[in-house]
Amino acid sequence: MENLDEVQWRSPEWIQAHQGLRTDNVLDYFAESPFYDRVSNNQVLRMQTQFNQQQTGQLTPQHFEQELQKMTGIEFVITHVREPDLWVIKKQNRLNPQQTTPISTYFVINENVYMAPTVAAIMQSRVLSTSMFLKRALEEAIELPSYSPSQGYTYEDSQLTTAGDDDSTPQASKAELGLLERSFRAAISGQQKYVSDIAPISSQSESAASSVPGTPVLKGRKLPLKK
């Protein structure tokens, strides 16, 4: 079954034959579209007036709507007009002259007829788009950090520099990337300073151990002999 809310329908031949689209003939134009219900009250009135030329001339849009109010069942009515390029048509179920239940809404815009999407369809589309962008963001965030037992989670300096050089990156993101880059370099500098501080201590320990007689050397470190 065709999904009508994805259909765009138009008939330039019909409009040319009827010398344009107006409020008094837009429902007749709509009746040619696949959105029209052939068992609606509109069709019943059209069949009744089709061969009655005198009644057809008197049946203006206002009189047509008044006749629909006397009936019960499915009907199409014009709810908004902005000539010459916009009409809103509502499909509804009439229960009595004062009470109706809306079913769907249609737009006639510049000779094109559309069906308005439902609220559920709009929400589904928005949630799907949001989920897709969240998935992309999480995939990119997972690839940013790297882990090592000695340093924990770190960010590659090349990744930070590349991201910071992108002109399309927002200022807030650039500031965060700059902070991460400075923290990363500070951590590296701290580790290098720690290694340089303990290097003389290690050298002194090795010199002291080498001065003790009978102490063998194993890979640059002095191990005392067991007695």
UniProtKB/Swiss-Prot annotation:
GO terms classed as biological process: regulation of transcription by RNA polymerase II
InterPro entries on file: Mediator_Med6 (IPR007018), Mediator_Med6_sf (IPR038566)
GO MF, one example: transcription coactivator activity
Positions of the UniProt region annotated as Disordered: 149-172, 204-227
Keywords: Activator, Nucleus, Transcription, Transcription regulation
Domain of life according to the entry: Eukaryota
Function: Component of the Mediator complex, a coactivator involved in the regulated transcription of nearly all RNA polymerase II-dependent genes. Mediator functions as a bridge to convey information from gene-specific regulatory proteins to the basal RNA polymerase II transcription machinery. Mediator is recruited to promoters by direct interactions with regulatory proteins and serves as a scaffold for the assembly of a functional preinitiation complex with RNA polymerase II and the general transcription factors.
Subunit composition and interactions: Component of the Mediator complex.
Protein name per the record: Mediator of RNA polymerase II transcription subunit 6
Organism: Yarrowia lipolytica (strain CLIB 122 / E 150) (Yeast)
